[in-house]
């Protein structure tokens, strides 16, 4: 039985994850962390200020974190102090925050950290990598769309796309939304859309002189991210104490 605490328990993702864990026969939802007190499927949710005492009391196997960057760093450090494995789906970390996370995790606890836990998105990333290897002389444009409340832009998933393209194509200049007179350079265009309740759309256009190839992924429900995070939570227990990605979970 895998015991789970959800951080960001009262948010959209936290509620989805809590539901899946609560219904899973091989898992136990033992509580949640958020900015305020509450309940998550009849389990206690405490403020983040009480996280150390809460983890010590509940003794979970895994903490699943979907919060914001600043809060997530503190949650990760607390989990590492208490020997709790981590699933981190929070995005928007600065380079300095990433270094802090690595220092807290490495050698202490296993952690799966990913900008997107959807199985489909991880396959999408693999396809983008393969396309970039074969189409290095094509122009490349990245577009992402999310709901009006998403705080970071570009999305973490889009940033991962750009990292993959940089690895395969070299570090091209990024053109973030074009306006006025433009001239095509050795660059990658990046376009961000925010509106409505869009769960998450990502596409990469490879444009050649005589053809275009577009690789895209569209999420219809946040449950797809929650399901992937819970799958990772099952996988991470008992692993060596270091940072993993969702592609490790999937064996890609």
Swiss-Prot record:
Where does the source fall among the domains of life? Archaea
The EC number(s) this enzyme carries: 1.17.1.8
Which annotated residues bind NADP(+)? Answer: 36
| Pathway assigned in UniProt | Amino-acid biosynthesis; L-lysine biosynthesis via DAP pathway; (S)-tetrahydrodipicolinate from L-aspartate: step 4/4
Subcellular location(s): the record lists: Cytoplasm
* Residues the entry annotates as binding (S)-2,3,4,5-tetrahydrodipicolinate: 147, 156-157
Q: Provide the residue positions that the database annotates as binding NAD(+).
A: 8-13, 89-91, 114-117
Listed GO biological process terms: diaminopimelate biosynthetic process; lysine biosynthetic process via diaminopimelate
Judged by the first EC level, this protein's enzyme class is oxidoreductase
Can you state which reaction this protein catalyses?
A: (S)-2,3,4,5-tetrahydrodipicolinate + NAD(+) + H2O = (2S,4S)-4-hydroxy-2,3,4,5-tetrahydrodipicolinate + NADH + H(+); (S)-2,3,4,5-tetrahydrodipicolinate + NADP(+) + H2O = (2S,4S)-4-hydroxy-2,3,4,5-tetrahydrodipicolinate + NADPH + H(+)
Keyword vocabulary terms for this entry: Amino-acid biosynthesis, Cytoplasm, Diaminopimelate biosynthesis, Lysine biosynthesis, NAD, NADP, Oxidoreductase
Q: Does the keyword Nucleotide-binding apply?
A: no
Main subcellular localisation: cytoplasm
Q: What InterPro entries does this protein map onto?
A: DapB_C (IPR022663), DapB_N (IPR000846), DapB_N_CS (IPR022664), DHDPR_bac (IPR023940), NAD(P)-bd_dom_sf (IPR036291)
GO MF: 4-hydroxy-tetrahydrodipicolinate reductase; NAD binding; NADP binding; oxidoreductase activity, acting on CH or CH2 groups, NAD or NADP as acceptor
Q: State the active site.
A: 146, 150
One Gene Ontology CC term in the entry: cytoplasm
Q: What does this protein do?
A: Catalyzes the conversion of 4-hydroxy-tetrahydrodipicolinate (HTPA) to tetrahydrodipicolinate.
Q: Cite the PANTHER family for this sequence.
A: 4-HYDROXY-TETRAHYDRODIPICOLINATE REDUCTASE 1, CHLOROPLASTIC-RELATED (PTHR20836:SF0), DIHYDRODIPICOLINATE REDUCTASE (PTHR20836)
Q: HAMAP family, from UniProt? A: DapB
Q: Which family does it belong to?
A: Belongs to the DapB family.
Protein name (record): 4-hydroxy-tetrahydrodipicolinate reductase
Q: Can you name the source organism?
A: Methanoculleus marisnigri (strain ATCC 35101 / DSM 1498 / JR1)
Gene encoding this chain?
A: dapB
């Amino acid at each position: 039985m895998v015991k789970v605490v959800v951080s960001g328990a009262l948010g959209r993702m936290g509620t989805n994850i809590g539901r899946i864990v609560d219904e899973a026969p091989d898992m136990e939802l033992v509580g949640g962390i958020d900015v305020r007190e509450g309940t998550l499927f009849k389990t206690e949710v405490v403020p983040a200020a009480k996280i150390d005492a809460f983890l010590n009391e509940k003794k979970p196997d895994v903490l699943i974190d979907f919060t914001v960057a600043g809060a997530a760093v503190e949650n990760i450090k607390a989990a590492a102090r208490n020997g709790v494995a981590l699933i981190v789906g929070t995005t928007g970390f600065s380079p300095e925050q990433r270094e802090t996370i690595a220092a807290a995790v490495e050698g202490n606890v296993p952690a799966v950290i990913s900008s997107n836990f959807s199985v489909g998105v991880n396959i999408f990333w693999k396809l983008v990598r393969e396309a970039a290897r074969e189409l290095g002389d094509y122009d490349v444009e990245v577009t992402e769309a999310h709901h009006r409340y998403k705080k970071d832009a570009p999305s973490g998933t889009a940033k991962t796309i750009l990292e993959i393209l940089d690895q395969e194509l070299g570090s091209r200049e990024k053109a973030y939304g074009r306006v006025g007179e433009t001239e095509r350079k050795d660059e990658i265009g990046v376009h961000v859309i925010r509106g409505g309740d869009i769960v998450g759309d990502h596409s990469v256009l490879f444009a050649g002189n005589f053809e275009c190839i577009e690789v895209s992924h569209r999420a219809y429900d946040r449950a797809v991210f929650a399901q992937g995070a819970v799958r990772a939570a099952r996988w991470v227990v008992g692993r060596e104490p270091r940072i993993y990605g969702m592609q490790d979970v999937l064996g890609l």
